[in-house]
From Swiss-Prot:
Keywords assigned: Cell cycle, Cell division, Cell shape, Cell wall biogenesis/degradation, Cytoplasm, Glycosidase, Hydrolase, Peptidoglycan synthesis
Residue ranges of coiled coil: none
NCBIfam families: PRK05337.1
GO molecular function: beta-N-acetylhexosaminidase activity
Site (Important for catalytic activity): 174
HAMAP family, A to Z: NagZ
Binding site for substrate: 60, 68, 133, 163-164
Gene Ontology process terms (BP): carbohydrate metabolic process; cell division; cell wall organization; peptidoglycan biosynthetic process; peptidoglycan turnover; regulation of cell shape
Pathway: Cell wall biogenesis; peptidoglycan recycling
Record's keyword annotation contains Hydrolase: yes
Catalytic activity: Hydrolysis of terminal non-reducing N-acetyl-D-hexosamine residues in N-acetyl-beta-D-hexosaminides
Catalytic site: 176 (proton donor/acceptor), 247 (nucleophile)
Name listed for the protein in its UniProt record: Beta-hexosaminidase
Length: 334
């Protein structure tokens, strides 16, 4: 299955045709697709109306610098702010993170979008792309926040997606623009980077997004292209039974598999259920690549947002005392 990107704030005729394709699982939205709360709700409805089957509408609404919907939405703090707060007041930090998850999920769901790819559970150890998107550099602290965040997302009717497996935070390179390799052995990764993923899976996380990072002591290819990582470790050893997303095939670190078709096939052959094709100019070739493939469609139904939510009532279950914690001002509108 493919999760595709579209060009603007309304669907074109070609994009409506794409949504008719059996291989299209849904659409991932970006800043380019957003003008207002009303507009994004209308776009979400148009996406669903164009598809002959239930589809996902997704976004990255993590908070901080990765927040695609801003005007009319709460200004969400980066996750690192909760880790900083945890050092001197663990309970209030966890409460604030739960409120952050509930608020984010409620606003996204009230806009007709099923899920935000969250939470980031990478360790915050200097990666250029991760930075303040991570809770902490400490695996146990990240694991604690992961459990709380997953549970809060579920409470707001949103599926939880752990990213970026098996851990993107320790390499320096940004895989959007460069290849990245982590030389550590599996035993070290299991003791550090995998700890939050274990916690999230135990908490009932619904999906995992793969990293485009190579871990040469474990497998020679990027994790998203690796049966060793997906089938043997994530599913076999860690017992994960949910949906596996690739990261975007337009990122530089994905180019090791060759052209667009090669990247799509490499992800699906490795065990990914859904391949992210975020750049509209790559969609047609990606759809051609999956012709004739057997695709996992049933697994995606569980990711569709649960329960209809109206914007006016979205904060009904949120404790007002957590809307503006001292280290995380996410209760104001952008």
């Amino acid at each position: 299955m493919l999760l595709i990107g579209v060009a603007g704030t309304e669907l074109s005729a070609q994009e409506r045709d794409w949504l008719q394709h059996d291989a299209v699982a849904g659409v991932v939205l970006f800043k380019r697709n957003f003008a207002s709360r009303t507009q994004v709700a209308e776009l979400s409805a148009a996406i669903r109306a164009a598809a002959p089957r239930p589809v996902l509408v997704c976004v990255d609404q993590e908070g901080g610098r990765v927040q695609r919907f801003r005007e009319g939405f709460s200004a969400l703090a980066p996750l690192q702010s909760f880790g900083a707060q945890y050092a001197h007041d663990p309970e209030s930090a966890l409460a604030a993170a739960r409120a952050h998850a509930q608020l984010m999920a409620s606003e996204v769901r009230a806009s007709g979008v099923d899920l935000s790819f969250a939470p980031v559970v990478d360790l915050g150890r200097g990666n250029r792309a991760i930075g303040d998107r991570a809770f902490s550099d400490d695996p146990q602290i990240v694991a604690t926040f992961t459990r709380a965040y997953v549970q809060a997302l579920h409470g707001a009717g949103m599926a939880a997606t752990l990213k970026h497996f098996p851990g993107h935070g320790t390499v320096l390179e940004d895989t959007h623009v460069d290849h990245a390799s982590d030389p550590r052995p599996l035993e070290v990764l299991q003791a550090e980077d995998l700890v939050p993923f274990v916690a999230g899976i135990e908490a009932g996380a619904d999906a995992v997004m793969m990293a485009h990072v190579v871990y040469p002591q474990v497998a020679p290819e990027p994790a998203g292209y690796s049966q060793r990582w997906i089938e043997q470790i994530l599913r076999g050893q860690m017992g994960f039974c949910g949906v596996v997303f690739s990261d975007d095939i337009g990122m530089a670190a994905s180019f090791s598999a060759g052209g667009v078709a090669g990247r799509v096939h490499a992800h699906l052959d490795a065990g990914c259920d859904v391949v992210l094709v975020c750049h509209p100019e790559l969609v047609a070739e990606s759809l051609q690549a999956v012709q004739g493939r057997s695709l996992n469609t049933a697994a995606l139904i569980g990711l569709i947002g649960r329960g209809a939510l109206g914007w006016d009532g979205l904060l009904a279950g949120t404790d007002a005392s957590f809307t503006t914690p001292p280290s995380a001002h996410f209760g104001t509108t952008a």
